């Protein structure tokens, strides 16, 4: 569906929400790459302001020179503007209100009006729906202005990839890292995907408070490429969790991977 929006070359802002590490940003990047669309990504933080987004004066060789921000660049080039982690923004994001309506923007500091070029549109990603994080999972996210949120016609609720899709993602990562997907590696990928799927189902049922993301699985593959040991890769990438969670996740993995104990030093 996102590809259809981007392929239409219409101005149609899209808000994508979902759990951390489930491929929201990657999906936008892939869609633009497949459609040969230019993508300009802006990582939003609570400190992001008009100067970061729209632009401002910079000191160059002793003179003040206007420098366009990424939003203006996207406007002029008809690119897809990605506001990544937009729910971390403060109310300074409201400088984009007129642009969010598909209109241009008047740069009062230089007295110039910028019109959007054909193909320009906006995609925003967030872990929340712009209403803050009630459970505290995403500390730092903010309640976004309702008028700002209302300027997004549609919202995609992105889930984690299916096991089949996730397996393809890990295979692609293996290819990128020059890891031959031979029999033992192929089994390793299956175990990882099945493991993550079980953890997520348990999370949704309220049985646990943590989750294994697609990004975490990619981290494990990268760790395996560096250290050459599957079990070490799994354990090191679980160290970010508290001891109880780490132990329960590891116990579940060992139940799936029957070779774990005997190959623990391999």
Placement of each model-derived feature along the sequence:
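C-terminal regulatory/interaction module of P-loop NTP-utilizing enzymes
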Residues: 1-266
